[in-house]
Structures are given as C-alpha cells and as structure tokens.
C-alpha cells in the first residue's frame, strides 16, 4: 500500500493503461509539455511523445470531435477538459456524435472514449468555471457517467473507463485532487455501474457522490453521537444509477436523504427521487428529501460561494428532521 494524492492516482491509472495498450492516447489543452492544469498528465509526454499525448489549441469542439473520430477508427482516446465547463463548447460533438453513433450505426461503430476533467465549486473560480454539469450530460443517450470521490476509486474507475467500449464522462472535483489515501500497489479495477456502501446503518439512507461524500462523512460523528444510525451510499455511477444497491438500502432504512452539489432543478437528485418513487414508493416511511446547490450562478466571493452548496450542519439537521418526523408518524 502507498499513500497517494488523487491527481497522482489518476495519472497512475492513465500511465498504466497507456503502457499496456498502444491505442490509448491523451488529447487536450496543456496535457503534454505542461502536464495538465492539475498535473494529472505530468511526465506522460516525455514517456510517450507527441503522438500519444497531444497538446491542442483552445478549441474544445475541434479536439473532442477529433477524439471521437479516433475512437471510431480504433484508438482509445482520453480527452481532458481543462475545466469541465469548457466542454459545453463541445456539447454537439458529445451528444450527437459520441452518445449516439453506436446506436445510429447499428452497432458498426464502438466509441471507447473517456472525457474527463475538473469541475465543481470551492476554488473561487467564478461562475463560468464552477459549474456542475452532471445533469446536463445525464440526459444524453449512450453515455456512461462516473464521479470519483477518493484516490482509491479514482484510479480503479478510470482504468475501467479507459477499457470500456462506450463513451464515459468522468467527473473529478477540483477540491479533491489533493486528497490523500493509501491505495494498493497491485492492479485493481472498479465497476463503472456500482454504488459504494460507505457506511452501513439502519435509520436512513444518505445518497451522495463526489465532494459531498466528504461533507456527509464529516457530519457522521455528530449524528452517531446523538443516536442516529445512517447508511451512506456513494453513487459513483450517475448514469446508469445503481438502483439495485439503492433498493437494498431503502428496503432496510425506509428513509432517504440525497446530498448533492448539483443544482436542485433537474439535477441528479431530481432523477433519483423519480426513480425511487417509481420503484420503491411503498417502502418509504417519509418523503425523499434532497439537499442541493442553489439555482444561481456560483459567486466569486468565498463566503457567498460556500453558502451556495450544502454544508455538514444542514445534513445533520435534515437527518434528524426526517428520522424524528417519520418515527412520530409510524408510531
């Protein structure tokens, strides 16, 4: 076991897959000589050269389209968005090409493509560079969507994403790159479509992902001290949602709290509520509650920025309210 930062875990995953498979390549702005805006691709250029670690102009629609073409013709490109918000400029390519070509070609084309990069709130990067785009991409048919949350799952998930024959959008949070954790030195893979049970409990199911996993775990000691026993699931897969793992948990706890950094309107939480009500309504002792970011552009001011996203004290209050109110009703 060795203790590594998340950005190092992501780089190790990329390096290992490039070493094993000559078709794996990296494409994006400053991914080569500079080593990536968050150093996820540092030193890969010197090892693999210009043809496999390709610096591009600031033209997201162009190099994303190029990567899609490369995937169709047999390569396994990894597109790094310097910031995931920039990929809105390539939304047409991601939606109409990457997401649909396997279907519209009658299965004649596969698209082994990973689109990865940083996003999220917390570094005072302003409204345009602090967007939460998970739900934007969730609506596109044909995409798989993953959000890593620890160095361990970041490495295992990225290796699985690179090997997958379908396009995978891989979300990384800007505030988690310097998170450290011991990870195995031996190779391991993590399935792209499975949630992780972070903590087992019996009172309430907390569904979360990415940075909010850590806000939830920060709230746990106070909840446990006050006699509450929550079960915590890190969704990891945002498309498809792992409704089987969610079902197992909800059938045990009968209460659900969703904690997300996504916007409240039409966010990941909204889709979760829809699926839980569709599949598990009779199992619920209380309405599903979601804690989401406010539907406003992210402020540049640090205090205002922090106020737009869910904090641990809000999670504590929500758990207590849901559990206490539903116990009163059921008794």
Curated annotation (Swiss-Prot):
Protein name per the record: Pyruvate dehydrogenase E1 component subunit beta
Binding positions (thiamine diphosphate): 60
Reaction it catalyzes: N(6)-[(R)-lipoyl]-L-lysyl-[protein] + pyruvate + H(+) = N(6)-[(R)-S(8)-acetyldihydrolipoyl]-L-lysyl-[protein] + CO2
GO CC annotations, alphabetized: chloroplast
Record localization: Plastid, Chloroplast
SUBUNIT field: Heterodimer of an alpha and a beta chain.
EC number: 1.2.4.1
Phylogenetic lineage: Eukaryota, Rhodophyta, Bangiophyceae, Bangiales, Bangiaceae
Role of this protein: The pyruvate dehydrogenase complex catalyzes the overall conversion of pyruvate to acetyl-CoA and CO(2). It contains multiple copies of three enzymatic components: pyruvate dehydrogenase (E1), dihydrolipoamide acetyltransferase (E2) and lipoamide dehydrogenase (E3).
Natural source organism: Porphyra purpurea
Required cofactor names: thiamine diphosphate
Principal subcellular localization: plastid
Taxonomy, superkingdom: Eukaryota
Enzyme class: oxidoreductase
Keyword Metal-binding: yes
